[in-house]
Structures are given as structure tokens and as C-alpha cells.
């Protein structure tokens, strides 16, 4: 089942494992980013440094303005809003093909949510309002449907698993789209059928009808619609119910070969997964072992059981108690 996985292209905040460019001159440790370096082509960026702020520097913050938040240095009162907005627009416009983003949590520039908003510069208490940082908001606005997370949320194994699944799936799709061949798109749909079944069965059927292409549509037009539906299907983590349905469907391929005790153990694992007592990786590993044991060719082709490189699967499915730092 081992595959030669595609390498996604991911924009990352440069202060995460790449350079000591945070406002206080530090580099931030992130186990997720460190692990992904072997499997991802990262594009590091520090929007604050790129807009002329030095290292170290007085920190910037989001400050309430008449027309919305402003990006202001708390010590000096200097407003960097226009510079940041101009940089974000220029950088993202020239980025080229990209598959996802990992941004610094709660950063007034990179944060994607939960960034504090202050009533003014200086020593004042933050308001109750939470916002996205300026660069983070530009990413979310310009790249809807793309995998975008911060390093803090990626410590949660469920969020991390969803992020990696959607990231590598969309990177594989980008390769298919670049190939320009209908046969490759049909193959992509077939190999991702169980992933799509777990995420959104209705959209899985829509994508199946698109790849059937009974209207004989041209490839560029068809993939535009396919991509829109695919991104919508992968936008949110799958619920446990549909995932269990997929695993039960796969289990059906082996029912005649398995011992009664094996069947009972698997069904018990499904119930424990349903009640959040074990991670998804436990029942998935059982099915993976049967795929190898019984040489089940159809399931062997399904990315549901191997959505991203195996060492990432082991960490992502390690359980609630373990976190990467």
C-alpha cells in the first residue's frame, strides 16, 4: 500500500521552524512543521519583515479604526496597515500554484482567527472582539476552500488529520489537473471514492457524474466545476457516522475470510471510535492489515487508507493525549 506521495506546496509563517524573525527575535518551535519538512515544499514568509519591520521590533497589534481594524505598532503608534495590505496582495498574486497554508496563531499579521483587537495603542486592555490578522484575512479571502490552519490548532489530532487529508488530496488533484487528461481525472475519482464517501456522499455522487462526462464537456471546463465541488466536499472534517459507514463497507470485503473473534474485535473498535475512546487509526489499521493479508486490490487503491505519508499517519492517529510541540 506504500505510495510515492505527491509533495504539496504550502505557505508557512517563517517564524515557525524557519527563521528567528518574530517581533522578540525568536524562532517558534512547531513539531508539525518540523515533521512536514520531509514531505512538503514550504514557502516561508514573514509579512512583518517584508513590510520593513526589523528584528527585533516593537510588536504590532490590531487597533480599532473608523473603517475597521488597523495594524499599529503599540509603542510608536505607527500605522502599517497600507503597507501590509499592499504586501499581502502582491505576494499572494505572485504566489503561483499552492495547496495550503500554515500560519502563526493569534498573530496580528498572520493569524487566521482569534487575534486580539485593541481600542488603541499603548497600555490598554483588549476588547472582546476577535479577528483575523491582515495577511491571514487576505489568505482566507483569496483562497476559499484551501486548507488553511495555524500551528496551534494543528496540535489537535482530528484537525491535523483533516488538514493533511485535504492538503494531500488537493495536491494530487492539482497534478491531475495539470496533466490535462480525462482518464487521469477518472482514476483520481475512483481512488478517492471512499474519502469522498466519508466526507460528503452527495458531492461524491456529483463528482462521479462529472467524471462520467456524458455531455462530452471539454476538460478545462469540467475540471473547473470538479474542483469547486471537491473543495466544498473537503471543507470540513468528516463526521464519525459516515467514516464508520466507509469502514463497514470495507469490512464487507473480508467477512467471509475473517474469524468470528476478528469480526467481533473490529466491530468493538468501531464502537470505541464512535464514542471517542480511540482514534480513527485503530480501525483503519485493522482494515489495512486485511487489505495486505488478502491482497484486496480495489481497497489497496483507495487513498482513504493511505491519504498521506505513513509517518504522518502514525503521529496524527496517536490519540488524544499526545501532542506535537
Model-identified regions with their sequence ranges:
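Acidic, Ser/Pro/Thr-rich low-complexity regulatory regions
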Residues: 142, 147-325
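Glycine-rich anion/phosphate-binding loops
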Residues: 76-95
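Conserved acidic residues
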Residues: 8-9, 99
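N-terminal glycine-rich anion-binding loop in soluble enzyme alpha/beta folds
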Residues: 20-21, 25-70
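N-terminal extension/subdomain marker
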Residues: 2, 6-8, 20-22
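Internal, conserved structured core segments that host functional sites
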Residues: 93-176
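Short, hydrophobic/glycine-enriched beta-strand segments
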Residues: 9-16
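Flexible, glycine/proline-enriched loop segments at strand-loop-helix junctions
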Residues: 19-22, 75-79, 118-129
Amino acid at each position: 500500500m506504500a505510495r510515492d506521495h505527491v509533495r504539496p506546496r504550502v505557505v508557512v509563517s517563517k517564524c515557525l521552524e524557519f527563521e528567528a524573525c518574530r517581533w522578540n527575535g525568536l524562532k517558534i518551535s512547531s513539531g508539525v512543521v518540523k515533521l512536514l519538512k520531509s514531505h512538503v515544499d514550504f514557502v516561508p514568509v514573514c509579512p512583518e519583515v517584508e513590510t520593513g519591520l526589523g528584528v527585533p521590533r516593537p510588536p504590532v497589534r490590531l487597533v480599532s479604526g473608523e473603517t475597521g481594524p488597523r495594524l499599529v505598532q503599540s509603542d510608536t503608534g505607527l500605522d502599517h496597515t497600507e503597507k501590509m495590505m499592499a504586501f499581502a496582495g502582491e505576494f499572494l498574486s505572485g504566489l503561483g500554484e499552492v495547496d495550503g497554508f500554515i500560519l502563526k496563531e493569534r498573530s496580528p499579521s498572520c493569524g487566521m482567527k482569534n487575534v486580539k483587537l485593541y481600542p488603541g495603542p499603548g497600555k490598554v486592555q483588549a476588547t472582546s472582539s476577535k479577528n483575523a490578522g491582515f495577511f491571514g484575512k487576505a489568505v482566507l479571502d483569496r483562497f476559499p476552500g484551501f486548507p488553511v490552519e495555524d500551528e496551534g490548532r494543528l496540535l489537535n489530532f482530528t484537525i491535523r488529520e483533516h488538514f493533511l487529508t485535504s492538503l494531500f488530496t488537493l495536491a494530487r488533484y492539482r497534478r491531475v489537473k495539470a496533466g490535462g487528461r480525462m482518464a487521469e481525472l477518472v482514476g483520481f475519482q475512483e481512488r478517492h471514492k471512499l474519502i469522498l464517501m466519508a466526507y460528503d456522499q452527495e458531492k461524491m455522487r456529483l463528482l462521479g457524474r462529472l467524471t462520467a462526462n456524458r455531455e462530452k464537456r471539454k476538460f478545462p471546463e469540467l475540471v473547473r466545476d470538479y474542483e469547486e465541488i471537491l473543495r466544498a466536499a473537503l471543507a470540513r472534517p468528516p463526521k464519525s457516522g459516515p467514516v464508520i459507514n466507509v469502514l463497514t463497507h470495507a469490512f464487507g470485503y473480508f467477512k467471509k475470510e475473517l474469524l468470528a473473534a476478528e469480526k467481533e474485535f473490529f466491530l468493538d473498535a468501531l464502537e470505541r471510535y464512535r464514542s471517542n475512546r480511540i482514534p480513527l487509526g485503530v480501525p483503519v489499521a485493522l482494515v489495512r492489515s486485511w487489505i495486505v493479508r488478502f491482497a484486496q486490490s480495489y481497497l489497496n487503491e483507495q487513498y482513504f487508507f493511505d491519504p498521506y505519508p505513513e509517518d504522518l499517519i502514525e503521529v496524527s492517529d496517536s490519540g488524544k493525549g499526545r501532542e506535537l510541540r
